[in-house]
């Protein structure tokens, strides 16, 4: 889990904010100390977008300005910061990833003779999409794990355009090669470098072409779910991929209280299942599964193979660091309104807002104290179709509809066991063509098995049982502690327990017909969840449908 700003200009500031030469930086209290904040911004999760040497040398497509210059990084919404407090400056939300790539696929690139198999790469981490800046009257506030207003899609598009232009423009390539190769610059190494450039551009182009749409998400929004699903389809190794336009951008959620919620993602399609490890500690299995999907969409390297057993898939995804980051989120608090800077809220307006909230919002959005980081939160989901006493939600259906219907040939995922957890079609076997969400879940479990050494004691055995169909997850909504190694929280109603099994071939290809299909189908994934609204003052834009 980036054109323009990562700055929220509060409405009150528009008339009065100046342009100070030096801004006063203010860090809000959110439950983290300095070391924990540094871990949030510096940890590699296994995303590998570009080799570091390339990122430092790559120019913007239409100029000689470096792609990650101070000005361009800030324009895109990723101000540069000193990674791990050292001299290396990376866009905020980018981290250095250095692993042995000998068994990787997409990122096992060689651009010079006798090159190391542990070249450093850069890629996104959680802070890339979940950190916020607020500018107000000469002060700069940082909101940790908030909702970015960076233009995430633009940075991917610019990277691809820069790779292509560098490969095609002789002068650009000469400058690039000189910077990347240094003392090892030679005709032979330039040939290797050009081939590596072409390979990297082709991989990024495959994902962006598969996801192509005329809709531009712009700052603060991204169809991250669609991108993650399409990346899972690419990682299947299937030869003939099906285009699935990522035309359902949503704003980025703030992450406080999310580990307490029973459903995750805008449509609630990821049940926040928790299990107990052999030491009796709660392990956030559902949250980890969702995060692995996000890192995969952000150019994590995954190597799938047919009919995988229990050895799992090799990948660059850092399950160990994901688990540590989730530990940080357990401690994260929503930012309190900074009265010392903005002034105390008007008491009359507070009373008016409280009344409006109780009349129009409280029925869906649960209330929880800012300091309450333990109480489980059962989120309210409102369906696209009328359901029981609920009227249809009446908002943009496409994030939920696309997640439910995106399909593709299954490639190496064919024959994997499909658990009820997080799959639209419930328990079964992945077929030759499948809904991507039906095959991404078993794929993510295979990624976990490939990192079993980074899992807590006993968790690999639970995943073994799930992927072989020996343990299925109940449909109960109850929150209860069960014996060690068993399910702790079902996280809502798994699709397989109550929903019809729907084959990919039943989904209409025509978009208008697909919309009608989603609006008239009863399914737990076809709706949106309403979460607690703590800290919402810091999470613009305020779109009710995300």
Residue ranges and their predicted role:
Residues 1-9:
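Bacterial N-terminal signal peptides that target proteins for export
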Residues 11-12, 21:
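Cleavable N-terminal signal peptides
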Residues 16-18:
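N-terminal signal peptide c-region/cleavage motif recognized by signal peptidases
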Residues 24-137, 141-146, 157-160, 164-358, ...:
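Extended surface/linker regions that mediate inter-domain or inter-protein docking
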Residues 136-157, 256-257, 268, 372-409, ...:
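Gly/Gly-Pro-rich "capping" loops immediately C-terminal to redox-active cysteine motifs
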Residues 375-472, 482:
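C-terminal engagement modules used by replication, chromatin/transcription, nuclear envelope/ESCRT
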């Amino acid at each position: 889990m980036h054109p323009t700003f990562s700055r929220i200009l509060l409405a009150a500031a528009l008339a009065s904010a100046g342009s100070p030469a030096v801004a006063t930086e203010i860090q809000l209290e959110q439950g983290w100390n300095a070391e924990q904040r540094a871990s949030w911004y510096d940890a590699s999760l296994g995303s590998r977008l570009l080799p570091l040497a390339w990122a430092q040398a790559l120019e913007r497509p239409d100029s000689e300005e470096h792609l990650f210059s101070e000005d361009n990084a800030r324009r895109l919404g990723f101000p540069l910061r000193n990674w791990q407090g050292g001299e290396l400056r990376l866009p905020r939300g980018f981290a250095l990833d250095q692993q042995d790539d000998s068994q990787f696929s997409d990122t096992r690139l060689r651009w010079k003779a006798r090159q190391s198999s542990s070249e450093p790469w850069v890629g996104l981490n959680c802070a890339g999409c979940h950190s916020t800046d607020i500018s107000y009257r000469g002060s700069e506030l940082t909101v940790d794990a908030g909702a970015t207003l960076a233009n995430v899609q633009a940075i991917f598009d610019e990277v691809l355009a820069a790779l292509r232009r560098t490969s095609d423009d002789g002068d650009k390539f000469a400058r690039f090669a000189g910077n990347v190769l240094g003392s090892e610059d030679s005709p032979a190494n330039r040939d290797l470098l050009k081939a590596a450039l072409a390979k990297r551009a082709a991989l990024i182009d495959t994902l962006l072409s598969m996801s192509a749409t005329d809709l531009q998400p712009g700052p603060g929004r991204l169809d991250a779910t669609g991108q993650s699903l399409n990346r899972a389809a690419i990682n299947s190794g299937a030869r003939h991929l099906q285009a699935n336009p990522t035309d359902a951008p949503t704003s980025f959620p703030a992450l406080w209280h999310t580990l307490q919620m029973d459903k995750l993602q805008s449509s609630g399609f990821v049940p926040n299942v928790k299990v107990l490890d052999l030491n009796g500690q709660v392990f956030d299995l559902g949250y980890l599964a969702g995060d692995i999907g996000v890192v995969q969409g952000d150019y994590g390297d995954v190597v799938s193979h047919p009919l995988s057993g229990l050895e799992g898939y090799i990948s660059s995804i850092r399950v160990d660091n994901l688990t540590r980051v989730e530990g940080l989120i357990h401690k994260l608090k929503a930012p309190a309104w900074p009265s010392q800077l903005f002034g105390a809220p008007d008491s009359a307006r507070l009373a008016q807002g409280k009344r409006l909230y109780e009349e129009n919002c409280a029925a869906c959005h649960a209330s929880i104290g800012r300091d309450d980081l333990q109480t489980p939160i059962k989120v309210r989901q409102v369906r696209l179709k009328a359901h029981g006493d609920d009227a249809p939600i009446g908002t943009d259906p496409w994030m939920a509809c696309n997640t439910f219907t995106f399909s593709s040939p299954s490639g190496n995922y064919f024959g994997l066991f499909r658990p009820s957890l997080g799959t639209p079609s419930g328990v079964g076997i992945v077929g030759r063509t499948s809904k991507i969400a039906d095959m991404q879940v078993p794929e993510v479990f295979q990624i976990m098995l490939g990192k079993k050494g980074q899992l807590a004691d006993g968790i690999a055995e639970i995943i073994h049982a799930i992927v072989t169909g020996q343990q299925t997850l109940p449909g109960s909504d109850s929150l209860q502690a069960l014996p060690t190694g068993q399910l702790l929280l079902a996280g809502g109603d798994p699709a397989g327990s109550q929903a019809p099994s729907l084959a990919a071939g039943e989904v209409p290809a025509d978009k208008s017909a697909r919309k009608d299909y989603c609006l008239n189908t009863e399914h737990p994934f076809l709706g949106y969840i309403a979460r607690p609204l703590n800290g919402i003052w810091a999470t613009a834009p305020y779109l009710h449908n995300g």
